[in-house]
Amino acid sequence: MIRSHMLRERAERLLPGGVDSPVRAFRAVGGEPPFLVKAEGACLWDADGNQYLDYFGSWGPMILGHAFPPVIEAIQKQAAFSTSFGASTPSEGDLAELVVRAYPSMEKLRFVSSGTEATMSALRLARAYTKRKYIVKFDGCYHGHSDGLLAKAGSGLATFGIPGSAGVPEEIAQLTLTLPFNNLDAVEAAFAAHRNEIACIIVEPVAGNMGCVVPDEGYLQGLRELTRREGALLIFDEVMTGFRVAFGGVQELRQVRPDLTTLGKIVGGGMPCGAFGGPAEIMDLLAPLGPVYQAGTLSGNPLAMAAGMATVSHLESSKEWLYPQLEQMSAAVAQGVAEEAARAGIPLTTNRQGSMFTWFFTGQPVRDYATAESCDTRRFAQFHRGMLDHGVWLPPSQFEAAFLGVAHTMHHVEQTVTAAREVFAAMQS
């Protein structure tokens, strides 16, 4: 990969680590990351002309595939009028109406430019509403890189084995209570120790940043009951799961209604976009109506609104067949690779919720961060490199979920399973 190598050398001179987001550096899996220049449907192309089958989907947004024509057309049409106004536009209301239809728990919402902004703003709102200062999050759940949410987070922190981030004052970190995922007893104990002090629980209702970890039956409902009893808010971080596992996210699947919801990734159709919302009683605390300040130059950016409208409207009109198709394809590829691992005698545990999944290199169930951490990351790195050599691009970390989109076909599934068979055989030799 001569061209990618040259681009990498230039990037390392100009960007810290040669990247704008740490996991992209491939440090956890080894080798040099290819530099991508084109994508269409379920396929990627690098600067050297190599083609790959994509199972990371830009970390989740590309549920309709890359360069989906209605999305591209919507962006091009809007760009001809302006890429940014910094003022109110009709498209904000258009997309907001779609989101509210999909997520009835969100009576009102506000658009921002990233998932990090959405979660950061939701926490500020929760603290203002409850007049409390502590928050509860869970080991391995990643909610963006704001200071108060980097304690024992997943994603890149898990990839690099870092418990938190330098530069976060101890006084801020102490206000975040980090508990094991899927453990209601630990949550009960935290509320008992901090009676009338906890503002909210924030949770990935299906975790994706320690790999895909599914909540135990009754866990989310238990969090809902606990927060109601204790006067705290429940925040579902559906940045990854929103419009992904179902049109209405995990809250639709599990029939649990949170107080606040954060969205990102798919809601912006691949453009920088996030959103947070909930009941009007809470949301109206935001300026200009209330005392909670939040603002952004590019919030509700018309390009993001156009891409989001094209994406979400297609998902809404197609949801009766689209989500069952994603389920069928995802089950086929997840099970197919797992069967090849079993034939090769390689311990593998598959976790999946709809079209997001992870192959954990362990023979034990993975239901929290501790069990995810016990996986054989060396073997995952071998698998990742082997699959990349076979033209299959997986997330470059054991602790990141993989994604499948509607552009994937059964031919792609067969290609992936065949590649896995050959890679597992090589790993055993």
Curated annotation (Swiss-Prot):
One of its GO terms (biological process) is protoporphyrinogen IX biosynthetic process. Keywords: Cytoplasm, Isomerase, Porphyrin biosynthesis, Pyridoxal phosphate. Its main location: cytoplasm. Its EC number is 5.4.3.8. It comes from the Bacteria. PROSITE patterns: AA_TRANSFER_CLASS_3 (PS00600). GO terms for molecular function: glutamate-1-semialdehyde 2,1-aminomutase activity; pyridoxal phosphate binding; transaminase activity. The modification N6-(pyridoxal phosphate)lysine is found at residue 265. Pathway: Porphyrin-containing compound metabolism; protoporphyrin-IX biosynthesis; 5-aminolevulinate from L-glutamyl-tRNA(Glu): step 2/2. GO terms for cellular component: cytoplasm. InterPro entries: 4pyrrol_synth_GluAld_NH2Trfase (IPR004639), Aminotrans_3 (IPR005814), Aminotrans_3_PPA_site (IPR049704), PyrdxlP-dep_Trfase (IPR015424), PyrdxlP-dep_Trfase_major (IPR015421), PyrdxlP-dep_Trfase_small (IPR015422). Coiled coil: none annotated. Its cofactor is pyridoxal 5'-phosphate. The keyword Isomerase applies. It is found in: Cytoplasm. This is Glutamate-1-semialdehyde 2,1-aminomutase. It comes from Acidobacterium capsulatum (strain ATCC 51196 / DSM 11244 / BCRC 80197 / JCM 7670 / NBRC 15755 / NCIMB 13165 / 161).
